[in-house]
Each structure stands twice: as C-alpha cells, then as structure tokens.
Design a protein with these regions (language model features):
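Generic alpha-helical segment signature
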Residues: 6, 77, 256-260, 374
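ABC transporter nucleotide-binding domains
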Residues: 259-464, 470
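ABC-family P-loop ATPase nucleotide-binding domain
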Residues: 189, 193-279
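H-loop (His-switch) and adjacent beta-strand-loop-beta switch element
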Residues: 467-479
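Flexible, active-site-proximal loop/turn residues at the rims of small-molecule/cofactor binding pockets
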Residues: 33, 272, 474
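Membrane-spanning alpha-helical segments of multipass transporters and channels
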Residues: 1-14, 20-224
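Acidic-residue sensor for enzyme active/binding pockets
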Residues: 8, 237-239, 244, 358, ...
Length: 479
C-alpha cells in the first residue's frame, strides 16, 4: 500500500488525475476501497485456510472477535499507510523505511514488548502507550488470541469469547479501543497532510485547506494593477505588448466578458538558493484568449514557458497577479477549472502497466463520458494519434516508444471535450510525420476550445496560431 501511494506521487500520476478532473474525495474513497477489499480477501483466505488445517488459534477462538479485530486492524493499517505516504516522494526510500518498520516492530514485539506484557510489575499505562504503534497493537491482539487458544485447548474448553473481554488480564478490549481511535485520528491527519503537503510536486497550503471547508466566493474580475497598485514600466514594453495589456484591462472591467483565458499581470519568482539571487521566470504576463483560438510560445529552456503552464494548471502558485479560465480564478477555483481542462505535461505521466486504451477509458470517465459515447471517444482519440491500428492501443504503455507515449499524452489532453487545453512541448520526441499529424490534430481541436502550446523548435506551426510569442531569453512578460 505504501509503495503504491508513493509511486503515484513520485510519477506525478496523482497530480495528473487531479488536473484531469478527479477530486480528492473520490480518489481517497477509490484507493481506500481498493486496499480494503484486497486486505479483506487476503485475511478471509488466511482465516479459512488456518481453520481448515486445524490451527487452534482460529478454531478455538470466537470467529466474531477475530472478525472485529482483523477488521479494525485492516482499517488502521490502510489509514497508517496514507499517513506515512504523505512524508515520502521516493518509492525506494519509502520501501526501505517500510521494511525497517515491519521487521523492527515484529522483532521488538516478539522479544521486548512480550516481556513487558508478561511482567506484572510493568505499568499498564505504558503498555497502552506502546500499543499506539500499529505493529505493537497487532502483536498484542495476536498474543491475546494465542494465549486464550492455548489455554482453551489445554483445558478442552473454548478460547476467547465476548465474555472474556471483561477479564482484567485480557488486553483485547483495550486494543480494540486504541486501534479504533487511532484509525479515526490517523485518517483525519493523513487527509490533512495530503492537502497541505507540497511533497510530490503539488501545491500545499494549510490555510487553503481550512478555506476549502468553507464556501468559496471567488473575487470578481478586477485588474491586478488596481489590486496591487503596481506600476509597469511602459517604456520597456513593445507596442503590441502594451496593446494586449490594455485589452486585458478592458476585459476585466467588463462583467460580460466571455474569454476562455485571461492572464492579468501574472508573475512568478523562484526564491534564490545557496546565496543566489531570486529567479524571475514570468514577469507581468497579460493575455486574453477567446474560445476557438490557439496561443503558442516558442523559446529555449528557462524562458518561463513551463512556469507559466504550471501556474495555469495549479502546480505552482503565482507570486503575484492572477489568471482566469472561463471566469474562474486560478487562485481559488482550480477544482472547478479542472473539470473543463485538459493537460499534456512536459513529461509523460503514464502508468507503465496499463494500455493506451485503458488510459483513455479512465480519463474519459473522469470527463463523465459513458456508454457508446465513451467507446467512440476512445477509439476516435486512438485513431487521431495513430495508436489504433495494429492493436497498439491494447499494448502496455511500458512497451511504447517515447513518441508513442507523447502521442498518447496528447490524446489524453483532448479527450472529453475540455474547454481549455495546455500542451507543454507536445512535439517533443516526435518524428516529422508525427509532428505534422499533431499540428493537424491541434488545428481541428481548436475549433471548440482555447489551446495554449509551448515548444523549443524553430518549426513551430505559426500558421496554426492566432497569437504567438517568441522568447529569446527569460523572463516571459507579455505576448
């Protein structure tokens, strides 16, 4: 469980799912339910097999107590995995720490914790404190079941029953209480840490989490020049830059403005490290993009293209300024923006064990496609990126070439008819024929949506663009 959760963070698959419209609640319920079902199936076979081969541990003790004990522990184990996963972004480190915990708690439980349990002079309060560790609480429960099974078998009687929970020397009742309380607390803490943690590339904000519990009211469209009282050095701007900025200001003052994307003085500064100065990546970007148009950015690495995309898709927060997608503020309404947004990230975020078709089915369902419309959308997407014929779409993504993965990422960004699409260097790794096919796909797709493209190549398809900007050096400040 731990490695599975951390893997999705490390590969940024969780972020990708969120950007395609999967909310945190359904993600948690689906993941929790998946782990719970697997654990219940495993534990059921474990108990049945132990009973069939005649182990007194299972046969003598009450099955009702065993069911309750294993049920509570399974839920505690899942909550604990979610909690611990919030501290890791590397599968290797998480796996090593996980094995150390399992073997360490097992060895300490068998040699040290058991000694404390059987020592009548050892304070019972300290036993309860030690049982906060899930591994020790599991060992204590198994120890009690084992002791009652042994004594019951020796005396020809039953093992642990519900009546035995009242025995002063029986620690099972305390164990069940401790694990139940810890399960609830661990689940709340795990969800909180998941929301506020920035580990794994997501944006974390403790205050934002508490705001999410309240009803959100996005501020009205208003120029950040008014909000920040920020004066721009106009003499540094070219004529077309100044004109676009004026257009944005006018649109922000118009309550009936219907633009797919409006960027208002969007700015991103990365703090300097090791004594280096701050890095200005995006300086005062103002942009208005209506539906049916495509905006392209061309420039070298470090010009601010990915920084701009990252702010627009919610991976990083703007230092100042803001942007609106169909009137929704990226600072407050990202969850709503995600439902109408498609993203082709700079690096392919895919499951190696799933097929291309399974990827598209999954993301299409997130966009509420069902039935015949779902199947048609998936097949059309595979055909558009040349992954349909020859059964390519039914092969695992791990067997795809780099270009095939890139084409699949493009298909994912367009499935479900998103109203706004961001493609960060979508032509990377594509041969000339595939690149030309990509531009044809974009040309067809832009009719019903606004598209933002970035690229490093001089072969950027300027005829496709209604607006484009060439970045000779960072920072990117306006079109």
């Amino acid at each position: 469980m731990l490695t599975y959760l951390v893997y999705e963070k490390q590969q940024k698959l969780k972020i990708m799912m969120k950007m395609q419209g999967l909310k945190d609640g359904p993600y948690w319920m689906i993941s929790y339910g998946y782990f719970f079902i697997l654990s219940v199936v495993y534990m059921t076979f474990f108990v049945i097999f132990g009973s069939l081969i005649g182990l007194n541990f299972f046969r003598v003790n009450s099955y009702g107590i065993q069911i309750v004990f294993f049920f509570v522990y399974i839920n505690l184990q899942i909550a604990f995995a979610f909690f611990v996963a919030s501290f890791f972004s590397s599968v290797k480190i998480a796996t090593v720490i996980g094995y150390i915990y399992v073997f360490g708690s097992g060895l300490l439980g068998a040699f040290l914790f058991r000694f404390f349990i059987e020592d009548i002079n050892f304070p019972r309060g300290w036993i309860l404190v030690m049982e906060i560790v899930p591994g020790f609480s599991l060992y204590r429960g198994l120890y009690e079941l084992g002791q009652y099974a042994f004594s019951g078998n020796a005396m020809g009687a039953t093992g642990m029953t519900w009546e035995n929970l009242k025995d002063p020397i029986n620690g099972m009742r305390d164990i069940l209480i401790v694990m139940t309380v810890e399960w609830a607390l661990m689940l709340v803490l795990a969800f909180y840490l998941d929301q506020v943690s920035s580990i794994g590339g997501s944006v974390g904000n403790p205050l934002l989490f508490f705001r999410c519990l309240q009803k959100k009211h996005a501020p009205p469209l208003q120029s950040s020049f008014v909000q920040q009282n920020h004066k721009v050095a106009v003499d540094m701007e070219k004529e077309d830059v100044a004109q676009e900025r004026q257009v944005v200001e006018q649109l922000l003052m118009d309550s009936n403005a219907n633009q797919a994307i409006i960027c208002d003085n969007l700015r991103k500064v990365y703090p300097g490290k090791d004594g280096n100065p701050d890095k200005l990546a995006v300086r005062g970007l103002s942009l208005a993009l209506p539906k049916g148009q495509c905006f392209g950015m061309l420039g070298p690495n470090g010009a601010g293209k990915t920084s701009f995309i990252s702010m627009m898709v919610g991976l990083t927060k703007p230092t100042s300024g803001t942007a609106y997608a169909h009137g929704m503020d990226i600072r407050m309404d990202m969850d709503n923006i995600y439902t109408n947004m498609g993203v082709c990230p700079q690096h392919d975020l895919l499951w190696e064990t799933l097929t291309g078709k399974e990827h598209l089915f999954f993301y299409a369902r997130l966009k509420n496609l069902k039935g015949a419309a779902l199947v048609k959308a998936v097949n059309d997407s595979l055909k558009s990126v040349n992954l349909f014929h020859g059964g390519v779409g039914d092969k695992q993504v791990g067997k795809y070439s780099g270009g095939m993965k890139r084409r699949l990422s493009v298909a994912i960004s367009l499935i479900g008819d998103p109203k706004v699409v961001y493609m960060d260097e979508p032509s990377t790794g594509l041969d000339p024929a595939s690149r030309n096919n990509l531009w044809n796909i974009v040309k067809e797709a832009k009719r019903n949506r606004a598209i933002v493209l970035t690229s490093n190549y001089d072969s950027f398809p300027c005829p496709l663009m209604h607006l484009h900007h060439r970045l000779s050096c960072p920072p990117f400040y306006c079109i």
